Amino acid sequence: MENPIKNNLIIELHVPDLSVVKSFYSKLGFEISMDDKPNNKELGYLTITRKDKLGNTMLNFYGGDERVYGQSFFKQFSKDTRRGYATEITITTSSIDELYKLAFTQLKQYIVRELKELKDHGHVWKDFRMVDPFGFYLRFTELIDWGQK
């Protein structure tokens, strides 16, 4: 599959500690694009980008301290609620083997399914799964046909 996915979807993940985000995701090749630190008036906002020949992956994080738990919608849930329940964040890469080696070397404890080849609906690809320090479920995968044109 060679057609990259082109869309304008913005993923924003609410977290209480942006330094944990920086440490974890930088080990997977993400770089900081924007870093607005929390202050007395406002929570912080962090944008990270992972460059790949298939296209860049951008993730956005909001929060940075305990005030994130007071967000208008999410405040109805306990602080201990696992982040991202029933959601999979899928990140395509042209270099799945190299990325897996990086993850295995630096973040092995977060891998919840090792790299393996899968077959489904006529597609064959490799992927692996991780859970980040906040509980967001991440799938790193080779590009397959999701209907992109």
Can you annotate each of these PLM segments?
Residues 1-10, 31-94, 100-131, 142-149:
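Vicinal oxygen chelate
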Residues 7, 11-23, 27-29:
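Long, hydrophobic N-terminal alpha-helical segment
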Residues 17-19, 94-97:
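Helix N-cap motif at beta-to-alpha junctions
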Residues 19, 123-126, 136:
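Short alpha-helical segments used as structural interaction elements across diverse proteins
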Residues 21-26, 103, 132-135:
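Conserved active-site tyrosine of GNAT-family acetyltransferases
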Residues 139:
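Active-site-proximal beta-strands of protease catalytic cores
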